[in-house]
Amino acid sequence: MLHLLGQDSRALARKAGISLEDARRITGAVIGRGAPLRSARNVRRAVLDRVEALATPGELRRVACTDAKDGFRRYLLELGDGARVEAVRIPLFDTHHTVCLSSQAGCALGCSFCATGALGLARSLRAWEIVAQLLHVRADSTRPITGVVFMGQGEPFLNYDAVLEAAYTLCDPAGGRIDGRRISISTAGVVPMIRRYTAEGHKFRLCVSLNAAIPWKRRALMPIEEGFPLDELVDAVREHAAQRGRVTLEYVMIAGVNTGDEDAAALGRLLAGIPVRLNPIAVNDATGRHRPPDEAEWNAFRDALARELPGQPIVRRYSGGQDEHAACGMLSSRTR
């Protein structure tokens, strides 16, 4: 692997001082085909020498690969310094895949329902280390990869520049060739970076992990609430929605904690006038501290949400890969 793997064609052309056409050919070889740099066709040796001189060799090694009974596949990958991250291949409609990528090794946010938070933060990933995760998965897949979600280990907006660089590489027509509208970047609510993201006008889908509309409840679940409280977060979401349209809000449902009528009412008040898509998902008991709602509790909460958020899409997310710790909130770099 090469550190320049994280560059899209335009960035590579600028950094290496080469033509955009040569950069596209190199990107097409290294990222589009997953081939060695020297396999790039119709590129002069002097240009390849220049690019190779700028590149620092790097490594991303597969440690383990486990298959869940529902078709999810979890990849445990080791970086050159020994740090480990995970990527998950998600089957869609028996025809294609979405890939969940990590932006950091571990996570500093310490959300109570997330196994990654219990690891602490080892370090942020470089752009090429993010892109290389997708290349590992793609090399192992017979179906096309048509979507990417930055919902693996880490907080993407605490590694903002590398995540955006990787995302643009993944949607480069010469590189990852993934429609930018099918790339989702999720944040636990780093308000200044949400505002920066909105101001910069990026084309990727923004998802915000909300999980409670009552401040003291959210604070107990997500320590980030201390630094970036709900009112500031919702203001940033409102600004983004005004410019880009509907924002996806993720909501981890925890039995007896955030699924009552008062929680639905608080959501209705908090999100009034903001076009959102609410994605509830049952908590996965990775930490042993929480349990998911049963069907009766979910049905009651769904009905309450429909009353409090009339006209807003409420789409329950499927939680796949649980038996192999590939599901949302379960990534902990375990080998089994």
Swiss-Prot record:
Residue ranges occupied by any Radical SAM core domain in the UniProt entry: 93-322
GO biological processes: rRNA base methylation; tRNA methylation
UniProt keyword terms in alphabetical order: 4Fe-4S, Cytoplasm, Disulfide bond, Iron, Iron-sulfur, Metal-binding, Methyltransferase, S-adenosyl-L-methionine, Transferase
Metal-binding found in the keyword field: yes
Disulfide bond entries: C100-C328
Active site: E86 (proton acceptor), C328 (s-methylcysteine intermediate)
Recorded GO CC terms: cytoplasm
Family matches, as InterPro entries: Aldolase_TIM, Methyltransferase_A, rRNA_lsu_MTrfase_RlmN/Cfr, rSAM
EC number: 2.1.1.-
SUPFAM superfamilies: Radical SAM enzymes
Molecular function per GO: 4 iron, 4 sulfur cluster binding; metal ion binding; RNA methyltransferase activity
Cofactor requirements of the protein: [4Fe-4S] cluster
List of residues binding S-adenosyl-L-methionine: G154, E155, S186, S209, L210, N211
Subcellular location: Cytoplasm
CDD domains noted in UniProt: Radical_SAM (cd01335)
Source taxon at top rank: Bacteria
Binding site for [4Fe-4S] cluster: C107, C111, C114
Co-factor binding comment: Binds 1 [4Fe-4S] cluster. The cluster is coordinated with 3 cysteines and an exchangeable S-adenosyl-L-methionine.
Family membership: Belongs to the radical SAM superfamily. RlmN family.
Entries under PANTHER family matching the protein: 23S RRNA METHYLTRANSFERASE, RADICAL SAM CORE DOMAIN-CONTAINING PROTEIN
Protein name, entry field: Probable RNA methyltransferase Anae109_4379
Lineage start: Bacteria, Pseudomonadati, Myxococcota, Myxococcia, Myxococcales
